[in-house]
Amino acid sequence: MEPISHLVKSSLPNYLSSLPIPDSVGGWFKLSFKDWLALIPPTVVVAGIGYTAYLAYCPAAKAICSAKTSGRCNNLIRKNEPKVVDMIDVEDIAEKAAFCRCWKTKNWPYCDGSHGEHNKQTGDNVGPIVIKK
């Protein structure tokens, strides 16, 4: 417990008091390169705490993070069915057909190119299944 006490009571205050924080706005322009380097670690710590708080308390950030990490593929199509299955007879296909694998299409089960936007959002590389006759 003594090392933590020393850190909080002595080391951290000494470090913070030695930082080259100017008294005026004009003082920021007079800082040397070495002074700017000394300000990087506390700036990174404050930015990290801010980003962590943003992820923890901002509803928009929670929605984005949970959508990327949920593991669910189908968020839209025929959610009332336990399993989505489409049977298509190969004889009904003219020359070729592209079928969706990303579950983002509005023309299910055919691909409408929605995987392009899906790939940008998630970093995925999914494309359609192309069936040729």
Curated annotation (Swiss-Prot):
GO terms for cellular component: endoplasmic reticulum membrane; mitochondrial outer membrane. It is found in: Endoplasmic reticulum membrane. The chain crosses the membrane at residues 36-58. Keywords: 2Fe-2S, Endoplasmic reticulum, Iron, Iron-sulfur, Membrane, Metal-binding, Transmembrane, Transmembrane helix. It comes from the Eukaryota. [2Fe-2S] cluster binds at C100, C102, C111, H115. InterPro entries: CISD1/2, FeS-contain_CDGSH-typ, FeS-contain_mitoNEET_N, MitoNEET_CISD. Residues 59-133 are cytoplasmic. Disulfide bonds: none annotated. Belongs to the CISD protein family. CISD2 subfamily. PANTHER family: CDGSH IRON-SULFUR DOMAIN-CONTAINING PROTEIN 1. This is CDGSH iron-sulfur domain-containing protein 2 homolog. It comes from Drosophila yakuba. The lineage of its organism: Eukaryota, Metazoa, Ecdysozoa, Arthropoda, Hexapoda.
